[in-house]
């Protein structure tokens, strides 16, 4: 009997101190991601958000273990932010009000011939390392630069990081860290006669004066093509035949904020309200679930080393084909 009570002690002790466990997790999370706060009040409010997010992650993963979801979540560097804050500070898609489709820029796929069942341009050397846009609405610049990098590799055989900051500072028809649009960026590169390399024009994550240097020009563009809205078959053809494609999605959900692995599909993801620009770098199938390989610009500590597998052929999930385009080089 005494032995039984003794064995229970550690269990009871642990059960009575969940706050200590949370304290330890919070301190470790802050240290891991270099978090510092201006005041104790600020830290308390941020911790409450973090705890709420942690609970959502735990509940989701329990449901996933029971087969309710095809993807898992994990805590990351965005843990002390609400999903509303993430959209406000870390997206940045801003479509021009006067934008309209033109037959001159519409992509018409060549439907003859098969395309691969899967393709991953990371393995083909078309994709530069994942970047972090920080709290600047420059997703459009990273998406555009990534698509240009893919075409540069295809044309020259060389992979070179191009400058999102060049686009942030110099595309006058966009709004820098206040947001922008990918085809506007492609038009700028075409009319400007080029875009600088990342090394020549490094990213600083804020609006600066345009410092484009023609002698540091690393790539040109001779126009762009837009994928027909809602047509995932056309997007697949474009990815297979052309290369990485700039797209927009709804990134407003907590499930996207903390995506970790698996094929992301959330029925609440709003295909009619896209707000974030990313890059499709391939497609495939996992355990019977078709997906797009998406390169994000929230750093390697987000998602699966900076990437998400987004559900493919699931009724335009998250609006992935609403604003898809690629540059011509």
Curated annotation (Swiss-Prot):
Where does the source fall among the domains of life?
Answer: Eukaryota
TM ranges = none
State the annotated membrane topology for this chain.
Answer: Peripheral membrane protein
Molecular functions per Gene Ontology: collagen binding; cysteine-type endopeptidase activity; cysteine-type peptidase activity; fibronectin binding; proteoglycan binding
Main localization of the protein described in the UniProt heading:
other
Q: Which residues form the active site?
A: 139, 276, 296
Entry keyword Disulfide bond: yes
Propiece residue ranges:
16-114
What Gene3D superfamilies does this protein map onto? Cysteine proteinases
Q: Does the keyword Protease apply?
A: yes
Q: What EC identifiers does the entry list?
A: 3.4.22.38
Alphabetical UniProt keywords = Cell membrane, Disulfide bond, Glycoprotein, Hydrolase, Lysosome, Membrane, Protease, Secreted, Signal, Thiol protease, Zymogen
GO CC terms, sorted: apical plasma membrane; external side of plasma membrane; extracellular space; lysosome
Check the record and name the PANTHER family matching this protein.
Answer: CYSTEINE PROTEASE FAMILY C1-RELATED
- Which function does this protein serve? Thiol protease involved in osteoclastic bone resorption and may participate partially in the disorder of bone remodeling. Displays potent endoprotease activity against fibrinogen at acid pH. May play an important role in extracellular matrix degradation. Involved in the release of thyroid hormone thyroxine (T4) by limited proteolysis of TG/thyroglobulin in the thyroid follicle lumen.
State the family it belongs to: Belongs to the peptidase C1 family.
- Name the chain's protein: Cathepsin K
Species name for this entry?
Answer: Rattus norvegicus
């Amino acid at each position: 009997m005494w032995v039984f009570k003794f064995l229970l002690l550690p269990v009871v002790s642990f059960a009575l101190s969940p706050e200590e466990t949370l304290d330890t997790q919070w301190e470790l999370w802050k240290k891991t991601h270099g978090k510092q706060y201006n005041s104790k009040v600020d830290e308390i409010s941020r911790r409450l958000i973090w705890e709420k997010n942690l609970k959502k992650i735990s509940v989701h993963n329990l449901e996933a273990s029971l087969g309710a979801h095809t993807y898992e979540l994990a805590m990351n560097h965005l843990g002390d932010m609400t999903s509303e804050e993430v959209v406000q500070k870390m997206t940045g898609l801003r479509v021009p009000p006067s934008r309209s489709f033109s037959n001159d820029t519409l992509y018409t796929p060549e439907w003859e011939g098969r395309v691969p069942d899967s393709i991953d341009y990371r393995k083909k050397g078309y994709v530069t390392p994942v970047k972090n846009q920080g709290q600047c609405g420059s997703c459009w610049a990273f998406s555009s630069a990534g698509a240009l990098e893919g075409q540069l590799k295809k044309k020259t055989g060389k992979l070179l990081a191009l400058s999102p900051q060049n686009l942030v500072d110099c595309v006058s028809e966009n709004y820098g860290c206040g947001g922008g649009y990918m085809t506007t960026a492609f038009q700028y590169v075409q009319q400007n006669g080029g875009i600088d390399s990342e090394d020549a024009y490094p990213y600083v994550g804020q609006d600066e004066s345009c410092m484009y240097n023609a002698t540091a020009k690393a790539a040109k563009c001779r126009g762009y093509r837009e994928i027909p809205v809602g047509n995932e078959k056309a997007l697949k053809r474009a990815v297979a035949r052309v290369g990485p494609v700039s797209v927009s999605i709804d990134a407003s959900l907590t499930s996207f904020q903390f995506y970790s692995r698996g094929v992301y599909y959330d029925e609440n993801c709003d295909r009619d309200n896209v707000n974030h620009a990313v890059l499709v770098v391939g497609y495939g199938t996992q355990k019977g679930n078709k997906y797009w390989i998406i390169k994000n610009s929230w750093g390697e500590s987000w998602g699966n080393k900076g990437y998400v597998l987004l559900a493919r052929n699931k009724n335009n999930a998250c609006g992935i084909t609403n604003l898809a385009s690629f540059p011509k080089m």
